[in-house]
Regions:
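Intrinsically disordered, low-complexity non-transmembrane regions of multi-pass membrane transporters
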Residues: 1-24
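Early transmembrane hairpin of solute transport permeases
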Residues: 21-135
Length: 136
């Protein structure tokens, strides 16, 4: 019997060779850029932003996706982040809501609503152990 031992491409503390890391990294970047850029383009179109403001919105999406990806890969204080090669990006779940807000109130209202929402998520996160008993 000839058994072939299969080895995972990524292990928790593995070090990839450069010949494995570059193609995998390029694949992740190509797959992620479309998903990160598209929500910004859709929201900019609804809010009737100028081309320069649209560019800033797209660049901001790319920068914060990179920061979130780095936090996942290299955890902060060992608590925030998974230490796994997880590509973070923009979520399409909120695009219809943001488009509705942007069509009526503009891009400033979108940023304000996201700021309030992020503060609420932080507050809920502080009390998650106490809240968890409410959700069996």
């Amino acid at each position: 019997m000839n058994e072939k031992k299969e080895q995972a491409l990524f292990e928790y503390d593995a070090k990839l060779s450069i010949s494995e890391a570059i193609p995998m990294g390029l694949q992740h970047v190509v797959a992620a850029v479309v998903g990160i850029v598209t929500p910004g383009i859709m929201i900019a179109k609804v809010c009737q932003l100028s081309p320069s403001d649209t560019t800033i919105l797209i660049q901001t999406s790319l920068i914060f996706s990179a920061v979130a990806t780095l936090i996942q890969l290299f955890p902060i204080f060992g608590k925030v982040g998974s230490r796994l090669p997880v590509m973070m990006g923009a979520s399409f779940a909120y695009v219809p809501i943001l488009m509705a807000i942007g069509a009526d109130f503009g891009i400033a209202a979108i940023f304000g609503s996201q700021l309030v929402g992020s503060i609420l998520v932080i507050i809920v996160g502080l009390f998650i152990k106490k809240i968890r008993v409410l959700f069996p």
